[in-house]
């Protein structure tokens, strides 16, 4: 039976449909918003695999080129591996729904969102998130939803719900928020140095507005009739938890006072190996291995969380507001354009900035059309950063997500193309990781760009905040460790300048986070950010005055657009010869802007002069140094500027009578000529005699 539910959501009509398409899936929802249509399906395994000890949720968001009336540009003319946009949207859907599955639910679940129709004014991410929420509710899979999702803009001091793509060009804020009826679960945003109050207001506003979508999903589920799965969580054995606590609690408390991550991890591993042996898990005579693992994790969590809530020092000895020790080095790689080594505790990022030309911009083939990005930030975290072995190669989803977050943080302070005509690439190599490596990439990226001489509008720093909450007691943690992220209730990353926030990312694992807690976290994050900014300014107060000697120099000039063909030449012959001769790279836009990139300044100036000569207009009455191209019986053809030739008549060569042109001129000879006339076809009449007369007159004067 086909069921349809529509509501007004912002300036668009939001429609959910089910019961017609993809009926073999456990649930399928067609979501429409404007002319954007997304099909979201959910399929779940009825039982968990033997020995499964984690929740295997997979979210795949995929865009089809036909959705925008396009044919893929690849050789095979079909969609290939996921684009960065698809990967980021998959993560955006995954993050708010993952915490809503019950603990110990290990059945495989797959969510697939396919964009079937794309409206240039409506991004498919919000419809896809809402569709995933609705499909999970209709599937009957254990899920504590639904969730709502909304995009919030901030234009002229007002919050805007689900702004169109064109409106986003004017907004100071692009924030996506998702949550249940009771609580916010996820926030992802970039901003133009906005205050904590404005950011918090946007989150609260988004949560209020999304209730419309949540109500629509609940009404759809009521009308469809949902059959809940017959799933019960495995019964816990209180006696097992007591036994494990007797065997390990004292040793664990001592282990969690070890400040070095590797030493602490090794000590804890040894404790659990001993516990497994004493309980007889390995030989099959003791309790179930999965039950023991869960009890061990619960004990770790209880120890760390209770210590923090009781006001005791954190794992590494800090209080809740202290940032780990920071060391910074800049300019450490001699041949790169800019580099920085940012170390905060046991998290370290080696960040490198590279300056390029317009042709180095990243070309992106998107559903909304092709465009280019002048700023790229790539994040790499090899396995050695955590003391492990593993696959090295193409970036994983996590690396792409962290890179995009760091990029969002820096975009607000970049100079405009008119101020600084370079394309920019920043690469963050995470060489050590113990929490908040993406925020280390923000700090290191800012310093590397300034080391490269990029005129940023200000320093940018990032910090990761955590939360421990039990009942009415809570503690906000500044600059969290990896263990605190793992055992805590929130991962809240905030980046910005001294003037305001430029990027924010929040993932909450529990319900019941209040506005007051979020405000406390934002205020505490500002304290930490200001502390880091002060250290960064001490090391590098401002950008380098000169760019690296190894970076390309860019010379920018403007020419008459009608002269572009002259610079390029037939089949590109002129510009090709020019670049080869001068050792430069030359890019010309349709409006006549010419960008000359060179490592050698002399080559750049030579290319500039040649282009100016090619595009220069010949002035009547002006004297030029011309080259004799060809001798004729009645005179000679002389080139006064590239592509500008004129006739030097035999009567204009000298004051005396000339019988033979060859007696006075030779091909290749440089002579001074005056332009006497230029007709409407551009033909020039030249004179050497007039130059001599002018010289004589000046001498007499």
UniProtKB/Swiss-Prot annotation:
The broad enzyme category this protein falls into is transferase
Specify the taxonomic lineage: Bacteria, Pseudomonadati, Pseudomonadota, Betaproteobacteria, Nitrosomonadales
| Family from the record | Belongs to the polyribonucleotide nucleotidyltransferase family.
> KH domain: which residues?
552-611
Q: Where in the cell is it found?
A: Cytoplasm
Q: What does this protein do?
A: Involved in mRNA degradation. Catalyzes the phosphorolysis of single-stranded polyribonucleotides processively in the 3'- to 5'-direction.
Recorded hits in Pfam families, A to Z, give: KH_1, PNPase, RNase_PH, RNase_PH_C, S1
Keywords attached to this entry:
Cytoplasm, Magnesium, Metal-binding, Nucleotidyltransferase, RNA-binding, Transferase
UniProt entry tagged with the keyword Magnesium: yes
Q: Which GO terms describe its biological process?
A: mRNA catabolic process; RNA processing
Specify the protein name. Polyribonucleotide nucleotidyltransferase
């Amino acid at each position: 039976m086909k069921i349809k539910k529509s509501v007004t959501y912002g300036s668009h009509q939001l429609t959910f449909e089910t019961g017609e398409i993809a009926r073999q899936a456990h649930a399928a929802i067609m979501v429409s918003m404007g002319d954007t249509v997304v099909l979201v399906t959910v399929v779940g395994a009825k039982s968990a695999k033997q020995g499964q000890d984690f929740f295997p949720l997979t979210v795949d968001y995929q865009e089809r080129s036909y959705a925008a009336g396009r044919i893929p540009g690849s050789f095979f003319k079909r969609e290939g591996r996921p684009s960065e946009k698809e990967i980021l949207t998959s993560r955006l859907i995954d993050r708010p729904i993952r915490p809503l599955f019950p603990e110990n639910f290990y059945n495989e679940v797959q969510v697939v969102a396919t964009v079937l129709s794309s409206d240039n004014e409506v991004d498919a991410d919000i419809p896809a998130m809402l569709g995933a929420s609705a499909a999970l509710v209709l599937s009957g899979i254990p899920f504590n939803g639904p969730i709502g999702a909304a995009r919030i803009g901030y234009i002229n001091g007002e919050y805007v719900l689900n702004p169109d793509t064109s409106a986003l060009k004017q907004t100071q804020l692009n924030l996506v928020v998702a949550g249940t009826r009771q609580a916010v679960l996820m926030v992802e945003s970039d901003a133009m140095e906005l205050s904590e109050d404005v950011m918090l207001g946007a989150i609260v506003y988004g949560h209020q507005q999304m209730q419309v979508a949540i109500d629509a999903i609940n009404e759809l589920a009521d009308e469809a009739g949902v059959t809940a799965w017959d799933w019960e969580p495995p019964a816990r054995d209180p006696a097992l938890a007591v036994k494990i606590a007797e065997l390990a609690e004292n040793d664990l408390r001592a282990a969690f006072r070890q400040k070095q991550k590797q030493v602490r991890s090794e000590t804890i591993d040894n404790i659990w190996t001993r516990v497994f042996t004493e309980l007889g898990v390995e030989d099959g005579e003791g309790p179930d291995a999965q039950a023991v693992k869960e009890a061990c994790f619960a004990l770790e969590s209880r120890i760390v969380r209770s210590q923090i809530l009781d006001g005791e020092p954190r794992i590494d000895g800090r209080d809740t507001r202290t940032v780990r020790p920071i060391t910074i080095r800049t300019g450490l790689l001699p041949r790169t354009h800019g580099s920085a080594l940012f170390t905060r505790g046991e998290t370290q990022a080696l960040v490198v900035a590279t300056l390029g030309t317009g042709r180095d911009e990243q070309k992106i083939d998107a559903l909304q059309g092709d465009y280019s990005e002048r700023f790229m930030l790539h994040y790499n975290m090899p396995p050695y950063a955590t003391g492990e072995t593993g696959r090295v190669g193409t970036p994983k989803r996590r690396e792409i997500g962290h890179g995009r977050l760091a990029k969002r943080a820096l975009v607000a302070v970049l100079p405009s193309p008119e101020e600084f005509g370079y394309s920019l690439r920043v690469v963050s190599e995470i060489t050590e990781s113990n929490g908040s490596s993406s925020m280390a990439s923000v700090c290191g990226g800012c310093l590397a760009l300034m080391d490269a001489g990029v005129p940023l509008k200000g320093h940018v720093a990032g910090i990761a905040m955590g939360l421990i909450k039990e009942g009415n007691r809570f503690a906000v943690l500044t600059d969290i460790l990896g263990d605190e992220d793992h055992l805590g209730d929130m991962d809240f990353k905030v980046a910005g300048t001294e003037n305001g926030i430029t990027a924010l990312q929040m993932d909450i694992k529990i319900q019941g986070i209040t506005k007051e807690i979020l405000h406390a976290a934002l205020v505490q994050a500002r304290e930490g950010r200001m502390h880091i900014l002060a250290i960064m300014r001490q090391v590098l107060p401002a950008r380098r005055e000169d760019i690296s000697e190894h970076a390309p120099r860019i010379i920018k000039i403007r020419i008459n657009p009608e002269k572009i063909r002259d610079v390029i030449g037939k089949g590109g012959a002129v510009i090709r010869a020019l670049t080869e001769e001068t050792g430069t790279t030359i890019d010309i836009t349709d409006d006549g802007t010419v960008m000359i990139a060179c490592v050698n300044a002399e080559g750049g100036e030579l290319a500039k002069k040649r282009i100016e000569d090619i595009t220069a207009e010949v002035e009547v009455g002006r004297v030029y140094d011309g080259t004799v191209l060809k001798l004729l019986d009645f005179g000679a053809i002389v080139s006064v500027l590239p592509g500008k030739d004129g006739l030097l008549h035999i009567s204009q060569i000298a004051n005396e009578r000339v019988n033979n042109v060859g007696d006075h001129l030779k091909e290749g000879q440089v002579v001074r000529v005056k332009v006497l006339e230029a007709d409407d076809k551009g033909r020039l009449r030249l004179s050497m005699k007039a130059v001599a007369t002018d010289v004589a007159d000046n001498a007499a004067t």
